[in-house]
Design a protein with these regions (language model features):
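Divalent metal-coordination and catalytic microenvironments
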Residues: 29, 49, 54, 79, ...
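Metal-coordinating catalytic core of metallo-dependent amide/deamination hydrolases
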Residues: 159-260
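Active-site gating loops and adjacent loop-to-helix segments of metal-dependent hydrolytic enzymes
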Residues: 97-129, 186, 247-260
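Catalytic pocket of metal/acid-base enzymes, prominently hydrolases
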Residues: 93-118, 134-149, 159-183, 234, ...
């Protein structure tokens, strides 16, 4: 994370990989680095970070001993702090439109006013979801968050779901985009399952920092057959699973037959 006016360059770096031999040197800042030999943080005064294409090529303090690329953009990071990006493990980016409204709200009121079954489900259009998701992702980058587990419970229809995914992919944020299976009046569970299969086949994931996941809150309350189907889908799609750490989910599940 980079403070001061230089954050714009770092934001561009995090969200866009330029073609060719692009190189950027963030010079003269305070770098919060990592010492692998001592297994601890290493704070470098007058430190610099050299980035080539989409990778960190060097982290150093003082003059650079190597050869700098001939085409180099230098960003003055004096009086700024440079660190790795933060990780947000639970975010609902589509809810950006509600920001500042729920600061004095109980959990029950939150569910009623702003949650997946709130009036938002009937008022928000797919375009509203897209804008909220994209702005929320870019806001995260602005705050130094570069990796997000996005609990996307705005999946009220196929159009809403695709809008949220489109914005996530466009943002460039490294994201575990967790598609939510919910109890929605106008979007049946079977329709949600078929859409998920379509999303698994989306070619945009192959060259993206976004990875598909599943969010599901009803393991203990929903129809067991529905829960089994969701676990089957997760296994079919080779998604990361909590089963290894949750004894309640370690039962053997037959491999389902779904379209390849």
């Amino acid at each position: 994370m980079l403070g001061g006016s230089s954050w714009l360059s770092l934001l561009a770096l995090a969200s866009y990989t330029a073609p060719g031999e692009a190189a950027t040197l963030f010079a003269g800042g305070t770098v919060i680095a990592w010492d692998p030999s001592a297994q601890r943080l290493d704070v470098l005064r007058n430190g610099s970070v050299l980035v080539e294409n989409d990778s960190i090529a060097a982290v150093f303090s003082g003059p650079y001993n190597g050869t700098l690329p001939p085409t180099l953009e230098v960003v003055d990071a004096t009086n700024d702090i440079i660190s790795t990006g933060f990780i947000d493990t639970h975010r609902h980016s589509w809810q950006t439109a509600f920001k500042t409204l729920g600061s004095n709200t109980t959990l029950l009121r939150y569910f009623e006013r702003y949650g997946t079954h709130s009036p938002a489900s009937t008022v928000f259009t797919p375009e509203d979801v897209y804008i909220g998701q994209l702005v929320g992702m870019l806001e995260a980058l602005d705050g130094g968050v570069t990796t997000i587990v996005d609990f996307s419970h705005c999946t009220w229809s196929a159009a809403h779901s695709r809008a949220a995914l489109d914005a996530t992919l466009e943002s460039g944020v490294r994201t575990e985009w967790a598609y939510n299976f919910g109890d929605y009046k106008n979007f049946t569970f079977d329709a949600q399952a078929h859409l998920f299969q379509d999303l698994v086949a989306d070619a945009r994931f192959r060259n993206s920092s976004t990875r598909l996941g599943i969010s599901y809150d009803c393991f203990s309350t929903a129809d067991p057959n529905r829960t089994r189907t969701i676990l089957d889908l997760a296994r079919w799609a080779s998604l990361p699973s909590p089963r290894a750490r949750n004894p309640q989910l370690t039962q053997t599940i037959a491999k389902p037959t779904y379209p390849s």
